């Protein structure tokens, strides 16, 4: 029963779904019209989530990755590179497209996290599930204040699930959470959004 709950938690709070929800909330929070929000949502998904997801699907089908949620540390490098290129493209073109500051900050935070986590990944595996949830919770609290504080319960929940499934150690989930929160706070502060 515990394992089923842990799997369900990990599947629901996966990096792709968490990113999608965060981009959706940021798009609607940072624009004045629904049309603009939908535009930035679609552009953000096309630049960030979709290419990474397609790369993972391709590599899984070619049996170069064990699964969509890459548990083998050495297999993560390819995905870090794809994610880094996508985030870098977003960081470059968003200012020219007039993207809202919150979305630009999110892409800079994403690129920063990819670089840091890719370096860590050379020697040690870190929990991306926990990192994505923690970064998203941090950004939501920054933007929405105390009303978003209720989302903090998702951090220990996802951390527990990753440990329960034996995909990560307690140190790996704690490191993922702390680094992700720190990166989000620093980037949003530098953008004047904190």
What are these regions (language model features)?
Residues 26-39:
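Short, hydrophobic transmembrane alpha-helix segments
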Residues 18, 81-92, 131-134, 180:
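Core segments of transmembrane alpha-helices
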